[in-house]
Each structure stands twice: as C-alpha cells, then as structure tokens.
Regions:
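DNA-recognition alpha helix
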Residues: 115-127
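Short, cationic-aromatic polyanion-contact patches
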Residues: 1-5, 51-74, 153-176
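Short capping segments at the starts of secondary-structure elements
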Residues: 13-21, 107-116
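A short, conserved structural fragment
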Residues: 41-51, 143-153
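Phospho-regulated, low-complexity intrinsically disordered regions of nuclear gene-regulatory
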Residues: 68, 79-88, 159-195
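Short alpha-helical segments that sit at the start of domains
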Residues: 1-8, 77-106
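Short amphipathic alpha-helical interaction segments
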Residues: 28-42, 128-145
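Fold-core signature of tandem repeat domains
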Residues: 13, 37, 46, 59-61, ...
Length: 195
C-alpha cells in the first residue's frame, strides 16, 4: 500500500461494503473511494458482488486483498479477524444500501407505522430528506421483497411493519457497515490506532 488512503480504505473492509459506506467510515471523499476500490478490483484485491447494479455496488476482498489487509493489520499492530461471508442475496443487499431504503431498515428496530419511522428518522438523522410518502413507498417495496411484514394490532386501523428474518440480517449488515475503524463490530474487530 503506497498511500494513506489505500491503507484506510483497505482497513475499512470489515464486510462487503459500497464506496459510499467506505467514504463514511474513512472521511475520504466518495469519488476517491470509488476510484481506489476500482483500482483494488483491477489489481485483483477486491471483487464486486453485484456487478449488474447501477448504484450501490458492493465490494469484498479477494484472497489477495485479505492477505494484504492481514499484513497491514500486523504491521500497524491492529487485531484481525476473518469475516465469514454469509450466504445471502448480495444483489438484494446492494439494492437495500440505497439511502432511503437503508434508513428505513436501520430505523425498524420494532414494529412501526410509517409515521413513527418518519418521527424516529427526524430525531436520528435530522438532515435526511425523506417524506412520509417516500417512507410508505419504501415500505411497499420492502414488502414485495419480503424484507418487512405487516403486523395487525387489535383495534388499530393501520398495520405496523417489522423486519422479517432476512430483513434483520440486512439491518445488522447495514449497522456493521457504518462501524468506523477502531469500533467493535460483531463480526470483525480492530483495536484503535492511527491508520
């Protein structure tokens, strides 16, 4: 790794992630992350898990990339743990990584109506531009993909929505993808240190 950005980006791979997620973790501009990840792929260090996607392309390290990451961790005195790639639909997960979809899924930690999702998002992410209609549209899309399911509650006119089993797996992946270098993740842990 010849530059600081290369090292930061390589260390950001705690699981399959998008260039936008790498940018959020490292503070490196998204365009630079996209360029560097494409360079990793060209050099055989990373591979795209959803190559037909137009947006939210997911990348993961090849065996060569994992060796480089492991060597870098050893060199920087960081702990390293191998990530077991789960057997999930990576095309679908890439689709979920789109901004509004991921925001709704990360917010659904209990059965909620779209209005409650909006209220929670307003507190958690005050700068997000999403309307109640956008949230209802996202919920409809997530229903068709079997990521959420409706829950009817007695004496309530409108259903609440909760994540299905696959939705909970996707939610955990989204949360882990936001873990910064040095933070613990349930699957991949680095000690703090300068990168």
């Amino acid at each position: 790794m010849e530059c600081q950005n290369d090292r930061k980006i390589l260390l950001a791979f705690n699981q399959p992630i998008t260039a936008k997620q790498v940018a959020g973790k490292t503070g490196i501009p998204e365009d630079t992350c996209s360029y560097m990840i494409a360079k990793f792929a060209k050099n055989g260090m990373a591979t795209c898990l959803n190559p037909i996607a137009g947006n939210s392309r997911l990348y993961w390290l090849t065996e060569s990339g994992k060796r480089c990451q492991k060597d870098l961790c050893r060199k920087l005195n960081l702990s390293y743990k191998e990530y077991d790639l789960p057997n999930i639909d990576w095309e679908l997960y890439g689709w979920i990584c789109f901004s509004h979809r991921s925001a709704v899924i990360k917010t659904l930690n209990a059965p909620m109506q779209p209005s409650k999702i909006k209220q929670t998002l307003r507190i958690q992410k005050p700068n997000i531009k999403i309307s109640a209609n956008n949230i209802r549209d996202v919920i409809r899309l997530l229903l068709t993909k079997k990521i959420v399911q409706p829950i009817k509650i007695k004496k309530k006119a409108h259903p609440r929505y909760e994540l299905t089993d696959s939705g909970r797996i996707f939610r955990q992946l989204l949360i882990n993808s936001n873990a910064h270098i040095g933070q613990n993740s349930s699957n991949h842990i680095y000690k703090t240190g300068d990168n």
